[in-house]
Amino acid sequence: MAVRPRIQLLDTVTINQIAAGEVIENAVSVVKELVENALDAGADEIEVETLGGGQGLIVVKDNGCGMSSDEVTLALKRHATSKIEEFSDVFSLSSFGFRGEALPAIASISKMEILSCPKGEEGSRTIIHGGEVIAAEAKPRQLGTTISVDSLFYNVPVRRGFQKSPQTNRIAMRKLLENRILSLESVGWSWISERQQEFHILKHQGLAERVAFVMGEGFMQEALRVDRVEEPIRIVGFLGSPCFHRPTRLGQRIFINDRPVDSPLISKQISEAYTMLLPPQRYPVFVLKLYLPPQWCDFNVHPQKTEVRILKEEFVREFLSESIGEVLARSQESSSYKKTSLTLPTLRFFDGQLPEISLEQPRESMSLPVTQLATPSIRSISSLGCQQEIPAVDTQTEIVWGESQEVRFLTSLGKIVLAEDSEGVHAIFTEAARKHLFYLSLIENQQEHYKSQSFLVPLCLEVTPQERVFLLSHIEEFKQLGIEISQIGPCVFAIESAPTFIGEEELKSWILSLAAESHTKVDKKAIALLIKESLTQTIFGKTLRTFDISWLSLLWQIGKPEKAFDGTLIRRLILDEDFIKE
């Protein structure tokens, strides 16, 4: 007979470790909580040091009010806090933390040391392992607190096994600290990662300087200043020029009452203001700080406090729409900005000038003698730009492919080409076919360098710190495609050469999009394929109106595939007349 389970109280360490599962996801969460504690202690100088992306060591030093030895002991107990006294205080918060859970939760899953000194006292040192205080002594220190966290998750091996790579943690940690740099202009920040200084921001540096540091000088050169008050609301910050946009929302920094938040409401409202100014599926870049009455905001939605409920949402929406709309309207009136469309160069896939069939020509039927063409191969597709003359095609000779297979070009119907072999009549979807052949050429040539041209003046590319890590990690993959990239500044790269089949502006836009969407991925092989797929999609993102009839031979050579690498339809065997009518 099974033993009846009995209800019992959990011990304090277990309770704190359970709480850590909600509050502390990784090393980045630890830095976030310790930094917020430092800010709530009134610090205006904060230094963060990390090793192994925080998995090895995290140290946060501040010059805040400090704690006495007794207060340190109390702070290690759950729900001990100096920030609220009763529940109603939650709805008028001026502090970043209030639950009193973070410090005991972190202490329960790590080896921690707290060195702290309040005004007029000597200071103390407390050592905690797995939530248990193992040593406490007097220790001199200047006003403030230093908290060191070592061996994170050492006593929770399951959690430790699910931690992300140090590189991923560093990327997330940088964004966390950048948000703090932007949100609090009166605080100086320093970050030392892997024993190297990442940045040092002085507390007297204003918002414009901080935005330039985080978002890049390129953003600030044409950024639009926002500063509007309609009591009791204020919005301040910088909007990106309409010519400065990204493929994702990663370039959007939103703060409410100096808290970095994820706010679909604000993001959507601002994106709508840019609707007529940006290309499709592109997003504006901005840094905006919204100040609302504390009683209008509920940050007690999630322990991470990155979500917020806004009480008078409709009023806030109208205020945002008017504020952003006015700034954008003024910028359009005072500038000569005009949207431009990129023009792709004509693409030729073979070592020669092959005949092309315009898909807008009248329908006609003809036989195509593949044997008289310079028989192409997948490997030859990447040889672009050679202009050699090819003998004219004899359109009356019947095609013989190999010894037993024959294929004939029949006619063109809009974006579809009809061809016939012994199996029947096939509809070839030209855009998908062309895209797939180009992609196969990239895969086939993965060990070779593509023919490229050097730029007389290298193209300058300004990226975010996250995108910088991605580019530095995959320089060799770009080089295999004939794209040579080098770093010339902290977040500035030079594109020195590139294949002739992609235009300069298209190239820059593609690299930025790829870096923005893929900076969290670390698998080298997956990234190499992703780069090739992404480049193919970029080049063939526009409607193409020509189709080399010699490409039919290539399609049959590779087994006349039905679908392209991305799942789009290339070929369909026509079984009845209804399909043609469709």
Curated annotation (Swiss-Prot):
Question: GO molecular-function annotation terms?
Answer: ATP binding; ATP hydrolysis activity; ATP-dependent DNA damage sensor activity; mismatched DNA binding
Under the heading Gene3D superfamilies, the entry gives: 3.30.230.10, Histidine kinase-like ATPase, C-terminal domain (3.30.565.10), MutL, C-terminal domain, regulatory subdomain (3.30.1370.100)
Q: Does the keyword DNA repair apply?
A: yes
Q: Which GO terms describe its biological process?
A: mismatch repair
Q: Check the record and name the SUPFAM superfamilies matching this protein.
A: ATPase domain of HSP90 chaperone/DNA topoisomerase II/histidine kinase, DNA mismatch repair protein MutL, Ribosomal protein S5 domain 2-like
What GO cellular-component annotations does this UniProt entry give? mismatch repair complex
Question: Which one Pfam family would you cite for this protein?
Answer: MutL_C
Q: Does the keyword DNA damage apply?
A: yes
Q: Which domain of life is it from?
A: Bacteria
Q: Which UniProt keywords are given for this protein, alphabetically ordered?
A: DNA damage, DNA repair
Q: Where are the transmembrane segments?
A: none
Q: Which HAMAP family match?
A: DNA_mis_repair
Family, as annotated: Belongs to the DNA mismatch repair MutL/HexB family.
- Function (record text): This protein is involved in the repair of mismatches in DNA. It is required for dam-dependent methyl-directed DNA mismatch repair. May act as a 'molecular matchmaker', a protein that promotes the formation of a stable complex between two or more DNA-binding proteins in an ATP-dependent manner without itself being part of a final effector complex.
Q: What is this protein called?
A: DNA mismatch repair protein MutL
Species source reads: Chlamydia abortus (strain DSM 27085 / S26/3) (Chlamydophila abortus)
